[in-house]
């Protein structure tokens, strides 16, 4: 016989044996999350001020080991905050304090070119590749420059650390220039050496040329895919959309576009992430009726995009407030990205936190995460 009762806020279930003497008692407690699981939460205020102060210079935020590093163009000052040990469900709290560290970046370093591979950072300075194990001390990496060529772009890297990598592709994808022409190149890291493969097809003029933003993710089949966006060259015909370029090996890149009215609009300094099983792009718009940051754009396939008007919002757009008379107010922080045309940089850390750093006009650091990525599922 089974009977039910309530004990406080818990449901009590009693299971009695046929002799009516032996019984087991079970108590069930249902816990309700007060947060909307699929909502991106940034908090009401930025988590910290931009430690570089009021700057119009380009910046780059990256993760390296247990640290998040913030670089500023034309500066040897690097700011660092530590990611504490633990898992995303441990209610970790960090990012309020940033420590100043002095670096020795090479002359002409382009901080927007920084990528991470195999627990090292790589950047370009005057078309030469440099690497660093800590982001502070940098050394030229002549091996990564093919003979008779210069490196014009570091695109991204493929690594076992990115997820299931059945093809065992580990290395750095770049663009090199030879005899006045640009080609895709891939430096594959083996146990003891680099093997560099340079393609024969010229890089399309539509491929992004600067301020690249890339992400690498594992597919359901266990292979890695890389995606990249960025600023394109001036004067291109029909350049009215932000097109994602994708690659399975770093050697060949294809544009993910189809004739459609549902393209991602043309954005300045676009950033792309694969997050919570979807793709997101943000950047600055340049429409007559919409300047600066407006919203995230999302796609499940990289081909058809739509603007996000709820749940996954830009930092500083606060929850709507219902006033008397049925009027709904849509408040936002003075440090919101909405409508701003500032320089910015963005990264996702291992705890699924999205970090967005704004330059002059915002000068703040925001940290956000989709709520359910911090839930403990039992």
Segments predicted by a language model, with ranges:
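Short, small-residue-biased leader/transition segments that mark boundaries at the very start
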Residues: 2-6, 11-12
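Repeated scaffold domains used in trafficking and secretory/extracellular systems
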Residues: 50-62, 103-118, 143-166, 203-220, ...
